[in-house]
Amino acid sequence: MKSIRRGDGLNVVPFIDIMLVLLAIVLSISTFIAQGKIKVSLPNAKNAEKSQPNDQKVVVISVDEHDNIFVDDKPMNLEALSAVVKQTDPKTLIDLKSDKSSRFETFISIMDILKEHNHENFSISTQAQ
């Protein structure tokens, strides 16, 4: 009698390799998406510290090179920004990201709004040199 030879089966190692590469691509793309859509060239600082991620809610106020103001990637004017800050809990961290080409006057206007509403929990983002 002849014995029936079983097939070697399907080799899944190349499939696993492809899945790991795709996973790495998805993870790297998701970190770029999480950084925000507004392109802001931050000023440099020698003593810049990395912020420690935590579970605290953060409101991001960005100013682009054309002095446009964005709150969490939504365009706003100073009056609308004042209303948002007024509604924001004083314990909520506000992260200020101002483009190095923007006017300092816009930055000062935002600081005045924060002071007007007694919001002292904020950080100013810079880029380490």
Curated annotation (Swiss-Prot):
UniProt membrane topology term: Single-pass type II membrane protein
Ranges facing Periplasmic side: 34-129
Superkingdom: Bacteria
The record places the following residue ranges in the Cytoplasmic compartment, namely 1-12
Coiled-coil features, chain-numbered ranges: none
Localization in the cell? Cell inner membrane
Q: Which Gene3D superfamilies match?
A: 3.30.420.270
* Cited Pfam families: ExbD
Residue ranges of the TM segments: 13-33
Keywords, comma-separated and alphabetical: Cell inner membrane, Cell membrane, Membrane, Protein transport, Transmembrane, Transmembrane helix, Transport
Which InterPro entries has this protein been placed in? ExbD (IPR003400), TonB_ExbD_2 (IPR014171)
Instruction: Return the GO cellular component terms, semicolon-separated.
Output: plasma membrane
GO BP terms: namely: protein transport
**Where does it mainly reside?**
membrane
Task: Cite the GO molecular-function annotations of the record.
Answer: transmembrane transporter activity
**Protein task:** Involved in the TonB-dependent energy-dependent transport of various receptor-bound substrates.
What is the protein's quaternary organization?
A: The accessory proteins ExbB and ExbD seem to form a complex with TonB.
User: What family name appears in the similarity comment?
Assistant: Belongs to the ExbD/TolR family.
> What protein am I looking at?
Biopolymer transport protein ExbD
Q: Which organism is it from?
A: Helicobacter pylori (strain ATCC 700392 / 26695) (Campylobacter pylori)
